[in-house]
Amino acid sequence: MKPLVVFVLGGPGAGKGTQCARIVEKYGYTHLSAGELLRDERKNPDSQYGELIEKYIKEGKIVPVEITISLLKREMDQTMAANAQKNKFLIDGFPRNQDNLQGWNKTMDGKADVSFVLFFDCNNEICIERCLERGKSSGRSDDNRESLEKRIQTYLQSTKPIIDLYEEMGKVKKIDASKSVDEVFDEVVQIFDKEG
């Protein structure tokens, strides 16, 4: 069985993580956050990638695609090796740019199927406010206004064109993420009930 993938995209603070947790609970997907995998790998003293990842994340730059894809692939392989039925994955925060997408197509072509892109559309100011709130408790070094403005710029320049590309293929499910968590999840449920 091939992994079935839903790419989850949206700016920082659009609520991707929160919604993914609910999708996992209700639909039995496995949630893979590209950012979290990179942050965990960065903390792993045995990692061959640790220092490199640290440097990129600190500078708010996008980590080389080979690293991200190898971490995603490793997780998918391990999950499916443990339980062959668990072949549905939410990949959150990836692909971030053209380079990511090309890397994915090159490495994963024929090895995984992308069902659709779940796009959480959210006003920048709302996203910033949410992240600043989260920064008080998350301990994430990149949840401060300056870093956020940079992340939103990167997102708009790099990720938005990817969403547009999938839009042309009719593969984007767009959700208004500025609403409350429950209202947003209602929209998510409508999509997953239809798409599986």
Curated annotation (Swiss-Prot):
Residues that bind a ribonucleoside 5'-phosphate: R39, K61, I62, V63, G93, F94, P95, R96, R140, R151
Cross-link (Glycyl lysine isopeptide (Lys-Gly) (interchain with G-Cter in SUMO2)): K73
One protein family per Pfam: ADK
GO biological process: 'de novo' pyrimidine nucleobase biosynthetic process; CDP biosynthetic process; nucleobase-containing small molecule interconversion; pyrimidine ribonucleotide biosynthetic process; UDP biosynthetic process
Enzyme class: transferase
Annotated PANTHER family: NUCLEOTIDE KINASE
Cited function: Catalyzes the phosphorylation of pyrimidine nucleoside monophosphates at the expense of ATP. Plays an important role in de novo pyrimidine nucleotide biosynthesis. Has preference for UMP and CMP as phosphate acceptors. Also displays broad nucleoside diphosphate kinase activity.
Protein name (record): UMP-CMP kinase
Lineage: Eukaryota, Metazoa, Chordata, Craniata, Vertebrata
